[in-house]
């Protein structure tokens, strides 16, 4: 894999260049300095080799921002990780002291280095390029990331430096399938006989060869980045006790026990009225997008605090997108005199969604139960990806009906002729019944709870679809 690192002082347009190269809006772009703090990873598609682009935070050693030492460390790690380096400067400002410091840091690495003179929006701007040779970098290219000017020349130069063969860009069959919206006839048009099995395709979007996408979500300062760093045994995300340290969604690819995971470390959601029209609001909207994108969501809460309205809001977003999830109760090392099972029992009683979730108490600080996160994710996703056999579904429902008969309404009783596990994403059962008017909310809840406990569907939002069918008579 060819790796390209983008470096520079704050507010020179690194994230705009990153988004332009990846052709996706992965990094937050804003005029406020320090928008990007962690390393962000993207990819350039359509090349003959895999290409990863690393966006780093703005380095300014003279800044009083206490995040700067962490940002510098992350930027240096990105530079060491990369094969080709892009030092981005603002051509309109000329050479600054920070630009010179960064050039001194990167030149000794003896890696292909391009000085990207960004914000060359006009012909006059481009003519100022000769001033930049004082930095001692021979490769200089003027571009405008915001106007997509000369980006193609930059990419071509990267191909040359990286010895990337030219190919005709085309989408692979795998990429086409990934973008396609599945369409299928789910139900047979033939009448359903009494307990007669129908040939109904089972729908699932699981792709075992692709990384399992895991979104870490939660309020600011609950330890999401600490959990990531603890799992990976390296500092990939900046950690601080100031809420809102992570602003971008940070994608981190990691392999464990021959399985690939793509962790998405998200910005914490905050009260909407306090973040409107700001970077934090953008981050909040990105958090919901990360939920929609994920295969499994990990909601992180602080063991020291009661479940807040914001935690419930996040959980409702997970439910809205029907995502399998696990609640991670972090900072368990700070809890004294409480048995874990009692804590979990009391937590389940606080909210209906919590009561239906899987809960794991952990400590990122001491790494207690961190490795159980992987096994919990695998178990949850295995349940989601597996079809419940039709005979098992119907045997379970038959037992359910015997234990608790539906009530009689106007001389008639609800009959369930047949049921199948219809889809995995979202998880859905299809039940064929005699009349929807005979199905009460109470009995639907009873059926839901029975299926949830019978097939261990805790942490898996699932739907019950009811379809009226007339029982075939001979």
Curated annotation (Swiss-Prot):
CDD domains: EngA1 (cd01894), EngA2 (cd01895). InterPro entries: G_ENGA, GTP-bd, GTPase_Der, KH_dom-like, KH_dom-like_a/b, P-loop_NTPase, Small_GTP-bd. SUPFAM superfamilies: P-loop containing nucleoside triphosphate hydrolases. Residues 386-470 form the KH-like domain. Keywords: GTP-binding, Nucleotide-binding, Repeat, Ribosome biogenesis. One of its GO terms (molecular function) is GTP binding. GTP 1 binds at residues 8-15, 55-59, 118-121. Residues 2-166, 212-385 form the EngA-type G domain. GO terms for biological process: ribosome biogenesis. GTP 2 binds at residues 218-225, 265-269, 330-333. GTPase that plays an essential role in the late steps of ribosome biogenesis. HAMAP family: GTPase_Der. Belongs to the TRAFAC class TrmE-Era-EngA-EngB-Septin-like GTPase superfamily. EngA (Der) GTPase family. Associates with the 50S ribosomal subunit. This is GTPase Der. The gene is der.
